[in-house]
Amino acid sequence: MYTRYSYNPSLGRTYVYDNKYYKNLGSVIKNANRKRHYIEHELEEKTLDPLDRYLVAEDPFLGPGKNQKLTLFKEIRNVKPDTMKLVVNWSGKEFLRETWTRFMEDSFPIVNDQEVMDVFLVINMRPTRPNRCFKFLAQHALRCDPDYVPHEVIRIVEPSYVGSNNEYRVSLAKRGGGCPVMNLHSEYTNSFEEFINRVIWENFYKPIVYVGTDSAEEEEILLEVSLVFKIKEFAPDAPLYNGPAY
């Protein structure tokens, strides 16, 4: 008669393994891969060490340079549910000569040499009716064929939600960035139409932007559309003053 503490040959023999010499096969393979990835990561970091001498802004909008805002227009638009509306068509009243002339005279002094580093299209959206609970949607395309005519209204397809400040910002700089024109005030004074086509659209994208809401009802929203110029300034060639105060 066997008890639970008796030795039963039919139960097989029991072996005790020394863990010092036996390891789990999966852990061995994982450790080998981990070491290999670590060595590759170290080599990759060494190749990037020379770049530590340079600084770059996480958000180009907050980078070096002066921001000059040109408000194109403020309008109230009605947006139906499940649809998005075109914001700017780049051929209407947003390019009034008076608006640009006032902006140029205030933002670009004649005595300074200034270069456009980047141009941002900034769209600020606000609901006109109180106590509305919805989020703003937006999507854009930077480039299209010159003869393409965008639709005024489209269906919502994979949009992105606008941030908490209800501001949608798009960088229009082409690859390489920057605008080679230095004396912007004189370039603009020569010809308004030529300045827009040759300076702005030659160096920056002309985007198509649609906005909408995730509301199930028709919403009335106030749009403020503006261009923000990121400007790099150069000191004017002015003679030094001589006198007791200097």
Curated annotation (Swiss-Prot):
Which Gene Ontology cellular-component terms appear in the entry?
A: viral occlusion body
What UniProt keywords apply to this chain's record, in alphabetical order? Answer: Viral occlusion body
The UniProt record lists the keyword Lipid biosynthesis = no
The GO terms describing molecular function are:
structural molecule activity
- Function description: Major component of the virus occlusion bodies, which are large proteinaceous structures (polyhedra), that protect the virus from the outside environment for extended periods until they are ingested by insect larvae.
Please give the family membership noted in the entry: Belongs to the polyhedrin family.
Which named protein is this?
Answer: Polyhedrin
Per the UniProt record, the lineage of the source organism begins with: Viruses, Viruses incertae sedis, Naldaviricetes, Lefavirales, Baculoviridae
